[in-house]
C-alpha cells in the first residue's frame, strides 16, 4: 500500500512539474559526465584522436519503479578540412513509468584555435530538435480517487496537447593544455516553450562550468595518474556542485565524487585504446535515500580506426568518465 501511494505521489508530482515547468524543469544529468562529453559541452565534438561511438544508460531512483531512465548514444569525429569536429547526439529520457518521454537529436560543430604550442581553445555550437510527449492514460490525480473503488473517476485537470516539439540552440567553449582543461557551456539559449497546457512555460537555460587536471603519479608516471575535477551546473532554481577525483592505473580507472547535498558517487571502469566501459553507483544522502535506492549508470565507448591525417591536431587529456 505504501509503495502504491509512493507511486501515485511521484506520478502526480510529475504532472505538477509539467504544469509548472518554468519553475521545475531540469535536464537529466549523468554522474559520469565526461563519459558523455557531447552532452556536457558541445565544444567536445571532435576532441578525440580518432572517431568514437559513445553509449550511456542511467537508471535513477529504481526504488520508485524506474522513475527516471535516461539513455543516449553519440558519434563525433575531427575533420582537418574544417579544423574542428562534428558530432551527433541522440538522447531519450523516460520519467514516471513512461508518463513523460523526451527525445532529443542534436548536431554539434566545434572549431579549434591553437593559441600557442601548449594551449588550445575550442568553440562549440549545437542545434537540437526536441520532442516531448505525455501519456495521459497513465496519469493519476487526487480527484480521480473513489474512497472504496480507487482510481475510477475522470479528472478535471486540463491538458491541451499530449506532445510538443521545438528547436533549441546551445554553445560552449573549451580550453586545454597538456595537463589542464576547463569548459563553459550554455544550453537552451532560446529558452523554448515546452508547455502541454497552452500557458507560457519556457525551458530555463542551463549553465555549466567544469575544470580539472590529469597529473602523473608515482615513479613511472606513464602507468598511473590522478585527476581532480569540479563541475558546477545551474538551471532555473536548481544548482549542484560535484567535487571528485579519478585514479588511473593501467587499464583500471577508479573514481569517487560528492554531489554536495545529494549523493556520493563511486565508479569503476576499464579503458583500453579501442574500448572503454564504466559503472557507477550514486549513494543518495538526501531525504529520498530510504526509498530511492540510489542510481545506476553504465557507459561504453568504442574507438574507431583513425583516418589518414595530413595535419596534426592537439587532443584534450581529460578523464573518460
Question: Which role fits each region the language model picked out?
Answer:
Residues 1-7, 115-117:
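Positively charged n-region of N-terminal signal peptides that target proteins for export
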Residues 2-3, 17, 214-217:
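Short regulatory "switch" loops immediately downstream of catalytic or recognition motifs
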Residues 9-20:
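Bacterial N-terminal signal peptides
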Residues 22-24:
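Signal peptide processing junction and immediate N-terminal pro/mature segment
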Residues 26-321:
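Subset of outer-membrane beta-barrel
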